[in-house]
Amino acid sequence: MRVASLFAALENAMKKLSLFRFAAPLLLVGALTACGSMMMQKAPATVADGVYVGANGMTLYTFDRDTMSSGKSVCNGPCATNWPPLMAGATDNPSGEWSIVTRDDGSRQWAFRGKPLYYWAKDARAGDRTGDGFNNAWRLARP
């Protein structure tokens, strides 16, 4: 009887090992796919006619008074009403030249090459660039 039970245990172990041999690669592929999708997040803006635009197609700008790579924006209050920030979601993860700064109110804003990005409230439609050079402090966001 001992030989028969050892044989049965060995046969059971081989079945489990065989199942693991096929399941392990599938689990690994699934895990790598999940990691890749987290790391390969879509950029928050695209390029149109040489400048960055938001998902709504509206032109994005940088503010000369923002200190590059400071991690914050100096355009708050009435400034942010006229120059709405390109907001980042709570789960957005920056990569490459994209970063996220924390605003005075605790909200998150996208930045490119360390400069926070903004829309101009007076741009009426996609493609407008009326904020470029405003007060000699606002610039088109370029790649």
Predicted regions and their residues:
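Short, low-complexity cationic-aromatic patches
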Residues: 43-58, 102-115
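Short, Lys/Arg-enriched N-terminal segments with co-localized hydrophobic residues
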Residues: 1-13
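Short, exposed beta-strand-loop hairpins at the edges of beta-sheets
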Residues: 119-133
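Bacterial N-terminal signal peptides that target proteins for export
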Residues: 13-24
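A low-complexity, Ser/Thr/Gly/Pro-enriched, surface-exposed linker/loop concept
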Residues: 72-99, 136-141
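Acidic glycine-/aspartate-rich tracts in secreted/extracellular proteins
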Residues: 64-69, 122-126
